[in-house]
Amino acid sequence: TQKVPLWLRLTATDIPGHGSAPRVTSSVKRILRAGTRIADTQFERRAVPEVQAYFAALAPFQDGERQVMMSNISRAVDNDAFMFTLQMEEPWRAALLSNTCSLTTLKGSNKINVVPPTAELELDCRLLPDQDPQQFLSELITIINDDSIDITRIMGFTPAISKTDTPLYDAIEI
């Protein structure tokens, strides 16, 4: 099972100006606020069936509490302490359990004393394979909560769940 890439560009527009006369609002302030809201969001955690099977297969090789949690990952996603530890120690595994967005590119003025008319933030979002991208975009719009920010889809794929009941997968398991 592979998460589905959805790359987005957020663009904020506001009145430009000079750095010596700060405005109440600016494109940079708007884009930073949007980025903070996204970065602070914990998207719903859940395990699709293939990911449940993956964690269950790893569980016997874990110790103590971690073994218990991984053997029933669908329940463990509600345990904040376990999920925090997993995120800190194995972020690639934690990422399998929710939609994610990494803030990757930030653009504003090319001069230190110029407040730009536009500022951009690019996101590398990865969606669970059964997630509807349009529904996710709607959720993101709600999180951003700023109608003046434009969202452009740079790239996105259709959902894809890899089958695990194939001869190749059987050979890998052996």
Description of each model-found segment:
Residues 6, 119-121:
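Hydrophobic core residues within well-ordered beta-strands of beta-rich domains
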Residues 12, 125-127:
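Hydrophobic beta-strand positions in extracellular immunoglobulin-like domains
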Residues 15-18, 156-158:
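A short, flexible beta-alpha/helix-coil linker loop
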Residues 55, 151-165:
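A short beta-alpha structural unit
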Residues 172-173:
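Phosphate/diphosphate-binding loops
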